[in-house]
Amino acid sequence: MKVGDRVVVRYRLPTGQATDALGMLVSADATTLTVDGKRGREHISVSDVIAAKVVPPAPAPR
């Protein structure tokens, strides 16, 4: 994954449940991933990440 890729990141919430962030990876460093998606910018601690991968571009609107 690199900045500018469309990604999905599954991460653990403080409650222990998991959730996904889907959108453009706008920054990544040793401690934090920042994903810009429909819910706005999500700052995700790398230690909370369960899985992450690059996904294809969103389909065109109909």
What is the role of each PLM region?
Residues 1-62:
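Conserved RNA-binding domains used in RNP assembly and mRNA/RNA metabolism
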